[in-house]
A protein has these predicted regions:
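ATP-dependent adenylate-handling active sites, centered on carboxylate activation for C-N bond formation
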Residues: 13-16, 113-116, 121-127, 131-132, ...
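Structural motif
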Residues: 92, 96, 152-156, 410-422, ...
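Short, well-ordered alpha-helical scaffold segment located
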Residues: 142-144, 454, 511, 557
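Short, hydrophobic/amphipathic alpha-helical patches that form generic packing surfaces
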Residues: 160-170, 327, 421-436, 547-564
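Short coil/turn segments at secondary-structure boundaries
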Residues: 174-184, 230, 236, 390, ...
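Long, Lys/Arg- and hydrophobic-enriched amphipathic alpha-helices
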Residues: 316-325, 529, 533-535, 543, ...
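PAPS-dependent sulfotransferase catalytic core
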Residues: 354, 486-542
Length: 571
């Protein structure tokens, strides 16, 4: 059961709510779920040891699920949380909430005939909605305890499964299940007897368009505020990968918060390019903490492990590295930590992507005032000539790449320059990191660099400023120059695990061949006939493709699991 699991039921009337709950109440109790909020029209159930705070509205017609902070990073008191759930949740109110508050939350409000759901802009808490028997269901996770409540008509959407296979590993907003509606990060979704409608209250492009170029945000202040608020006084397992982003998260914690970290974990492999212990050790020495070094050996890749991660509304791309996730999950449990703290998302929000499009942004934003030195530095950084033909080619390639994406954040990029649009695409992809994984069953997986304050700071800065001087994440490096060891700041390479994963997957080819070529996807005609030729050690080690195979295996396990779940539900 995911630590962030909960299901909210809102009845059209009290009788409909009780009819829905009564036959499932014992099932919930046997599985360790309990009622967290109860009112005539509304009920919330979650695992007894779950990590989501649940506060019912004072009038009984709304609920706040998760944690929420004000602009100064202070958590709202229970009374204020209860008041927040009392107010009507229309577009104006939703915009005010997203402007005044941030966090990891869902805000739900019932009114006559419909239910309004606001999902926070970070997307840290999942949200899927549906209707059945006069009740609106809002789920943050897909544990099979909820199966009796799923729509009777719900089934596998093979068209969406095919889309997942065409673009393996990428976050896809639409669900491969019918009659279930995903709510995007920053979306206000209203659903009721007469149907529903949606408004995207927060989107990255709007943050960029509203920016004040004369008053750039304080990137460091935004990071420190978010990291410290989300960490709170809890006990954590923290990632120290050896990269810049996890080093920044470590630096942003207060001294007292660092003292509460139960383990600073670095995973390494016996390949030079995948061994970042020297960098992680430098961060640990800088803060006077002990580094836990975990040597990686192969991948635990079998049907049982893949199925363990398949209880999600989508194939769990965030669980693509089973050994990493299993190790963190075990440490959370053994050390009685609240969850894991990571640097995920920093590449997108701080702009790590090497691209000529940054030069095009300089021209786009400054027109005739474009600075020649900026263009020269970009060309030198990328070792490519900054010809207009090259810029146009890269721009066309980026537009083509995101054309098949379905995320609402990408639906309106008008007046957003090319490199900034690339950043928005990267942030949409990073919703993968907010998704479920085995480690999130033991405790919340918190990614502070994907929080609303940090995303807004990164989006409000131009791509030129973020990469000033022709350096990836230059603004972040400058902001934390006094807090991160120079060994990290001056580093120009990134850890590379491709060779390790390639060899690890190659060792599991006999299993993958049987699992994929004789599985549900093959039966549905969705496996490329050429896959057989790619399932060889030579092809994998010399031409790559391990990520595609792992994603295919996850999708296969997901289809098998949901086929069984839906079949049992109908018996």
């Amino acid at each position: 059961v995911a630590a962030d699991s909960a299901i909210i039921l809102v009845g059209d009337d009290p009788a409909a709510l009780q009819v829905a709950i009564a036959p499932v109440r014992k099932r919930l109790s046997r599985r360790g779920w309990s009622c967290k909020a109860n009112a005539p029209f509304l009920a919330v159930f979650a695992p007894s040891g779950g990590r989501l705070d649940v506060t019912g509205a004072l009038d009984g017609h709304g609920v706040l699920v998760g944690e929420i902070f004000d602009g100064a990073g202070a958590a709202l008191a229970p009374e204020a949380r209860g008041v927040l759930g009392c107010r009507p949740l229309d577009e104006a109110r939703a915009r005010a909430v997203c402007s005044d508050y941030w966090g990891r939350y869902l805000l739900i409000r019932r009114s006559a005939g419909e239910v309004a759901i606001l999902r926070d802009p970070s997307g840290a808490v999942d949200c899927v909605v549906w209707r059945r028997g006069g009740v609106t269901f809002v789920a943050t996770g897909a544990d099979d305890v909820i199966d009796p409540w799923l729509p009777e008509s719900s089934g596998i959407d093979w068209g969406e499964v095919a889309a997942l296979i065409r673009r393996p590993g990428e976050h896809r907003h639409r669900l491969p299940l019918t009659d279930l509606t995903p709510v995007a990060a920053g979306e206000l979704r209203t659903i009721g007897k007469a149907g529903g409608h949606s408004q995207q209250i927060w989107r990255p492009a709007d943050v960029y368009r509203r920016r004040d170029a004369n008053e750039p945000p304080d990137l460091k202040a935004a990071v420190v505020l978010a990291v410290r608020a989300l960490a709170g006084s809890r006990r954590w397992v923290a990632e120290l990968s050896g990269g810049l982003d996890s080093a920044i998260v470590a630096a942003a914690l207060s001294i007292d918060q660092r003292a509460k970290v139960a383990a600073w974990v670095n995973h390494y492999v016996d390949h030079r390019e995948g061994d970042e212990r020297d960098y992680a050790r430098a961060v640990a020495r800088h803060h006077g903490v002990v580094l836990t070094e975990v040597r990686r050996e192969g991948l635990r890749l079998n049907a049982q492990r893949l199925e363990a991660g398949a209880d999600a509304f989508r194939p769990a791309s965030n669980d693509i590295d089973p050994d990493y996730n299993d190790d963190i999950a075990e440490r959370i449990g053994a050390l009685e930590a609240w969850g894991s703290l990571t640097g995920q998302g920093g590449d997108a929000v701080f702009f790590q992507m090497p691209t000529l499009l940054v030069g095009l942004d300089e021209i786009w934003e400054r027109r005739l005032g474009a600075r020649v030195e900026v263009l020269h530095r970009m060309s030198r950084w990328l070792r490519r000539p900054l010809w207009l033909t090259a810029l146009a080619r890269d721009w066309r390639e980026e537009v083509r790449h995101r054309a098949g994406w379905t995320h609402p954040w990408l639906e309106d990029l008008k007046s957003v320059p090319p490199a900034k649009a690339l950043q928005v695409s990267a942030l949409a992809f990073c919703q993968t990191f907010q998704g479920p994984a085995i480690r999130s069953r033991r405790g919340a997986c918190v990614n502070p660099l994907l929080s609303q304050p940090v995303m807004e700071a990164g989006l409000a800065l131009s791509s030129v400023d973020l990469t000033w001087g022709g350096r990836d994440r230059a603004a972040a490096r400058a902001a934390f120059a006094d807090d991160v060891p120079s060994l990290i700041l001056d580093r120009r390479s990134k850890g590379e695990l491709g060779a390790y994963y390639g060899q690890a997957v190659a060792h599991r080819l006999p299993f993958l061949r049987e699992f994929l070529l004789g599985g549900a996807l093959a039966q549905a005609g969705l496996i490329d006939p050429a896959l057989d030729a790619r399932l060889t050690r030579d092809h994998l080690l010399w031409r790559g493709g391990h990520s595609e195979l792992l994603s295919l295996a996850q999708t296969e396990a997901w289809v098998r699991r949901w086929r069984d779940r839906l079949g049992r539900r109908r018996v």
